Structures are given as C-alpha cells and as structure tokens.
C-alpha cells in the first residue's frame, strides 16, 4: 500500500489518513504562513489536514486545499479535512451556523470531520474567550448531549462526513455513548498525546468503544507562553528519543510520530518548516521494535503541556479526572 495513504476505518465506515498535518500557529505568525505550509504539506504527501475555527486560519487553509485541487495535484475526495466547533457555539441552535461559517471561510462544500473542540462552554458571541470587566471568563451552561444531537444533524445534512470530539475525558465520552437515542458515535477523540503523556488508559478505553484516538502536540507542543509553562521539558530533546533517533537514523520527531502509529493512534504533525514537513512523511519508512516501544512507554510522566486551566472551574472542565 502506498505509505502516503495509510488510513484507518472509522466507526461510521469513512476512512481517515493516519498521519495528519496540524495547522495551528501562535497569533504572531502571519496567516500567510498557514497557506504556504498547507500547500507544502499537500505537495509532500499529507492528505489529512487539521484546523479549527479557533485557529483563525481556515480562509488560508481552504485556499491552499483549493489551489492544490485547481492545479490537479489532488481531488477534493483525496483530502481529509477536519474543523472544530468552538466553545462559544455549543448551544444546539448555534452548531450548524458555526460549521457553515467555517465552510464559507474555507470555500468548501463539506468537511470530512467536525469535532466538538473542548467540552467547556462559553457565552455565545464573536469573542472566542469572552470575559467580564474583571477579566473573568464568561462561561455558559450547555448540555453537551444537546450539542451532540446538533452535530448529528450536521452529518445528516452532509455538511460533515464524520463527527467526533476533542479533549473529552472518559466520563464525557460515556455520557455521549450512553445518550438515549444516540444516532452516531463520535468517530474519534482528539487529545494531547506524546511520550511524556501517553494517554494509555484513555487509549484503551477508546479502542474498546471503536473510537480512534487522535494525538495533538505529538511532538511536544508549540510552547506558546500564554498556554505552556516555559520551564516544561522539551520533548524532542529527550535523551532516550535522541538515542533511538540515532539508532534508526531518523529524527527524534519521527520517533515520536512512529510511536503513535504503532500503538494505533492517528497522529498530527505540526510544522511550518518545509524541510521538516517533508521529513515527517518518512514516518512510514521505518519501524520501531517492541523493545523500542517499551522504552518509549517508559518515558511517560503524565505531563500535559496544555492544561488549558483558564477553563478550569466549570464541571465540564475535562482534565480533573484521571483520564
């Protein structure tokens, strides 16, 4: 099988490429970079592109996809595109308009996957993180089961081929799975996952329910100071990963990506650097031994880079549970 198109079958029978290109960049990075990087990624062989309303780059990412379709490089059906519903649009009547807005920005007719980005709801409006005059976040109270029903309607309407969630814990997944009248299970749960935070328990739970775990921050994280502790260890400088990279004549990033593929995790690789974008496609060109895998398992320290603790407080904050 052509390595570039290795896919996993989702519980709704659609197929998702196991290696995805992450498009998030900190706000100071010019949006034009998202356009260039996404084009480079498609040229390098990436077929799974991950973005979100929150990233404020869907116009550029959509333009990149459409330009690679226009020049004959790919067809629309070759591309697996993911967008995400932000927390200010959890109210059921706001779900479809939010997706339609993403589609308008993208200039696409449908997304392949639409995710509930984060389980905490904030007040509706233009602001992605609405705050009161004292700088406190304005939370909203929304039943996520009602949000999910609106997501199901988006799938029925053909606006999203598949629907899933992101940053949900086991309890929140079970709440959806046990919902009376559930029409479609989430196809995936996209969460932070890397050798320092390997999500073993959540992965086992997801596998038992035929839900794919998709890894973000698989290479550590963007280390944006607003979100990430600058003193946290740099994953790709880990001596064990560096030693394995040397052994396999690969980069530490490729070791971290390959680790996920071999445990049945779909992995997102985020880079705006042309050389590294091309390099990350080499994840299909080598294999880790079971000893290597055990060694990497041993690096786990249950360390999250993205605690998103500005959202802590409401009962739906997902990271207080063990998993």
From Swiss-Prot:
Entry keyword set: Cytoplasm, Lipid metabolism, NADP, Oxidoreductase
Pathway: Steroid metabolism
InterPro entries noted in UniProt: AKR (IPR020471), AKR1C (IPR044482), Aldo/ket_reductase_CS (IPR018170), NADP_OxRdtase_dom (IPR023210), NADP_OxRdtase_dom_sf (IPR036812)
GO MF annotation, one: androstan-3-alpha,17-beta-diol dehydrogenase (NAD+) activity
Subcellular location per the Swiss-Prot or TrEMBL entry: Cytoplasm, Cytosol
GO biological process, one term: bile acid metabolic process
EC number(s) given by UniProt: 1.1.1.-, 1.1.1.112, 1.1.1.209, 1.1.1.210
Residues at the site labelled Important for substrate specificity: 54
Active-site positions on this chain: 55
GO CC, alphabetical: cytosol
Residues bound to substrate: 24, 117, 222, 227
Site (Lowers pKa of active site Tyr): 84
Binding residues annotated for NADP(+), in chain numbering: 20-24, 50, 166-167, 190, 216-222, 270-280
Catalytic activity reported: a 3alpha-hydroxysteroid + NADP(+) = a 3-oxosteroid + NADPH + H(+); a 3alpha-hydroxysteroid + NAD(+) = a 3-oxosteroid + NADH + H(+); (17R,20S)-17,20-dihydroxypregn-4-en-3-one + NADP(+) = 17alpha-hydroxyprogesterone + NADPH + H(+); (17R,20S)-17,20-dihydroxypregn-4-en-3-one + NAD(+) = 17alpha-hydroxyprogesterone + NADH + H(+)
Keyword Ribonucleoprotein in record: no
Known role: Cytosolic aldo-keto reductase that catalyzes the NADH and NADPH-dependent reduction of ketosteroids to hydroxysteroids. Most probably acts as a reductase in vivo since the oxidase activity measured in vitro is inhibited by physiological concentrations of NADPH. Displays a broad positional specificity acting on positions 3, 17 and 20 of steroids and regulates the metabolism of hormones like estrogens and androgens. May also reduce conjugated steroids such as 5alpha-dihydrotestosterone sulfate. Displays affinity for bile acids.
Sequence similarity: Belongs to the aldo/keto reductase family.
Subunit structure: Monomer.
Protein's name in the database: Aldo-keto reductase family 1 member C1
Organism: Pongo abelii (Sumatran orangutan)
Lineage, uppermost ranks: Eukaryota, Metazoa, Chordata, Craniata, Vertebrata
């Amino acid at each position: 099988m052509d390595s570039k198109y290795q896919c996993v079958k989702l519980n709704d029978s659609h197929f998702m490429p196991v290696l995805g290109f992450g498009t998030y960049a900190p706000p100071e990075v010019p949006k034009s970079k998202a356009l260039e990087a996404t084009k480079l990624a498609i040229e390098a062989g990436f077929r799974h592109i991950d973005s979100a309303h929150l990233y404020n780059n869907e116009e550029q990412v959509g333009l990149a996809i459409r330009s690679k379709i226009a020049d004959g490089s790919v067809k629309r059906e070759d591309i697996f595109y993911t967008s995400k519903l932000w927390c200010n649009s959890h109210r059921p009547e706001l779900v479809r308009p939010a997706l339609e807005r993403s589609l308008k920005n993208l200039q696409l007719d449908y997304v392949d996957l639409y995710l509930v980005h984060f389980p905490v709801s904030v007040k509706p409006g233009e602001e992605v993180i609405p705050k009161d005059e004292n700088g406190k976040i304005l939370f909203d109270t929304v039943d996520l089961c009602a949000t999910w029903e609106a997501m199901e309607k988006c799938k029925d309407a053909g606006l999203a081929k598949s629907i899933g969630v992101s940053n949900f814990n086991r309890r929140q997944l079970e709440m959806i799975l046990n919902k009376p009248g559930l029409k479609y299970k989430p196809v995936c749960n996209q969460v932070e996952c890397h050798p320092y935070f390997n999500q073993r328990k959540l992965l086992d739970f997801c596998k038992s329910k035929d839900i794919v775990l998709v890894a973000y921050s698989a290479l550590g994280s963007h280390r944006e100071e607003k979100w990430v502790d600058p003193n946290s260890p740099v994953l790709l400088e880990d001596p064990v990963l560096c030693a394995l990279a040397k052994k396999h004549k690969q980069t530490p990033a490729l070791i971290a990506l390959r680790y996920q593929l071999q445990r049945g995790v779909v992995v997102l690789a985020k880079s705006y650097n042309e050389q590294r974008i091309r390099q990350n496609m080499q994840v299909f060109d080598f294999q880790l031994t079971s000893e290597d895998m055990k060694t990497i398992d041993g690096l786990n320290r249950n360390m999250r880079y993205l605690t998103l603790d500005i959202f802590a407080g409401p009962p739906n904050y997902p990271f207080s549970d063990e998993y």
